[in-house]
Amino acid sequence: MLLASKKLIIVTTSHRPTQRVRSFVKDLASVLPYAVKVNRGKASLLDLYYDAMAVGAKRIVVVGAKKGNPGIVRVYAPREPPEIGLEEIAVISLSGVKLRREHQEAQKTFNTRSLGIDVRGIGDEIVRRIADTLVRAFLAKLVVFDEDVEKVDVLAKLRIEEKELVTTFICSTTGRVCGPTLRIIAVRDNVAGYRVYIPGAGRQKPT
C-alpha cells in the first residue's frame, strides 16, 4: 500500500525476492529522494505504473536477484498515456552489495529529500558517465564543488576498486554511512544511448 503523500520514486523488487533483496530495497529507498518502498507481491509492471501515477512518482526502481543477492537494478519512468506505460531508462548490473547494517557505525536516515552524486576530483570519463546515469535514474544532483555538499541530505561517493565501481551513501551532515554499498560492474543508459563496463575503467572508452 502506497503512502498518501506525494512520492518521487517507488522502489520495489522483482517477483519472489529473497530476504536479502528485501533488505537491500529498504536500504536503497531510504537514501533516494522522496522514495517509498513497495512490496511487489503479484503486482505487474502495469500495476506499478498506476501506483506511480497515483502518487506522482517519476521513477520506479525494480531490484532483481542473482543467486539470491541483489544483482540488477532496473529503472523505469512512467509515461502518459497509459498505453505508453513504463520506459526503461537505465539498467545497473551489480556484482554484490553491502547492507547498511553490515557497515560499522552506520546510521539510519529518514525522509531523504535530496541525493548528491559526488564527482569532485573524478576525471575518469567512464565514472563521470555512470555518475550522469545515476543522476538521471535516481533524480539526484551532481556534486561538483565543496559548497554543493550542504545542499543535499545524502551523498553518494564513487570509487574504482579492482574491477568495480563502489558506490557508498553517506549522510552529508555527519559523514557516516547511511545506506547500502553498491558494487557496480556495468550500466546501460537507454536515454543517453550508451553501455559502460567497469573493468579497465581507466583505459576503455564509452560505447
State each model region's role.
Residues 1-207:
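Phospho-regulatory, Ser/Thr- and acidic-rich intrinsically disordered linkers and terminal tails
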